[in-house]
Amino acid sequence: MKTYDLIIIGGGPAGLAAAVAAKDNGIDNILILERDKSLGGILQQCIHNGFGLHTFKEELTGPEYAARFIEQVEERGIEYKLNTMVMDISLEKVVTATNREDGILLLQAKAIILAMGCRERSRGALNIPGYRPAGIYSAGTAQHLVNMEGLMPGKEVVILGSGDIGLIMARRMTLEGAKVKVVAELMPYSGGLKRNIVQCLDDFDIPLKLSHTVIDIEGKHRVEAVTIAEVGPDRKPIPGTEERYTCDSLLLSCGLLPENELSKSAGVELSQVTSGPVVNDSFETSVAGIFACGNVLHVHDLVDFVSQEATAAGKNAAAYIKAGEKDAQAVMLPISPEGGVRYTVPSFVRPSEMEENLTVRFRVGDVYKNKVIAVYFDDQLISKKKRQVMAPGEMEQVILKKNKLEEYPETKKITIRIEEA
């Protein structure tokens, strides 16, 4: 059995950034395992621009952004295996993987970074009524067909869900000559970034119908029409609000789920809100020596934030490998999301071990206008940040300062909540 200091599962933007950071922090024996035929992950099919504004201070396409990190991996001589499927991670950090060249691989790791990304909700998970003809795709599948294979999924399109991929595909299909008739969103707010709504829908006069869902799909062999209806506060269709659209394709953009089957086999505790691992300030999971970053941890809007978190995870994994497993556990303070905050990453902070400035990222559960993000140490208000608009589709963040925590050594809990301005 071959032994590595660090095994990174996933060669997308998170895995690449984590590998580079670990190498730069003194770890040489690193292996990246990637199930696709190339590094770069989902970025390879995201040929639109808008990437890299934070990381490189310039606007790049997805493949360009990935290429910069792939170049850094190659320059550092970091080993990677492509077309390699990881099947299991044991409690002893033994990774079982398979590929055509090596057959079954058993690899022992001192530390593991989980960077498997996320997947789309399928039609089956959405329980849409109607027939099951050809022409129903997830937005990511349609994106792969158009951008990677040069194939058009359809000419007349209805999109269910207003996640970022759905919004971007509304624009992409329009640019390729299709007619996007409507984007329907179950919730009373969009699940995507404001800039994507403007650039992908408003600029192309594509209607967005909030509080609407698909209630019927017609067609025996191919999609012929879909019926959408308005939904009430209980998210059930309101009789009499039905609208029928003739179309040959239905794209589904109804949310992303972190890909955590391997995390479960490794015994990692998962969050009920994000479906990703519960991590502390070093991005270490409930299992010592297993770290997580990127969309496997929680779904991001911007790849730049993925790279930032992955860089921190890589650096912390390197520190763990050098120090070995510590018997004495540092004091862990829980970060409690309350009053409109759905979750936080990280979920725990170790005041003695944390960086001087720790970025805590979170999402809100509804649209809020002219509110403040309040941070409390127990019942003591520490900071307030005013925000004009907050929406579930846009990630928020606050900075926790180590020196501030040291001023309140008796703190038992950190609370982040939304309050009136």
Where are these predicted regions, by residue range?
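FAD-binding core/adjacent interface of flavoenzyme oxidoreductases
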Residues: M1-I9, A67-E156, G232-G240, L251, ...
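Beta1-alpha1 glycine-rich phosphate/pyrophosphate-binding loop at the start
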Residues: Y4-R68, Q72, H144-N147, P153-Q199, ...
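A Rossmann-like FAD-binding core segment of flavoenzymes
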Residues: I70-A97, T174-E261, E356-Q388
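Predominantly flavin-linked oxidoreductase catalytic cores and closely associated redox partners
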Residues: I104-L105, A111-L208, T213-R222, G289-A292, ...
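FAD-site-proximal beta/loop scaffold in flavoenzymes
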Residues: L114, I136-V146, S249-H300
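Mid-to-C-terminal Rossmann-like scaffold of FAD/NAD(P)H-dependent oxidoreductases
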Residues: D304, A312, N316-K385
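Short, aromatic- and glycine-rich surface loops/edge beta-strands on solvent-exposed regions
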Residues: V360, I373, N403-A421
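Aromatic sugar-binding surface patches on proteins
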Residues: P392-K401
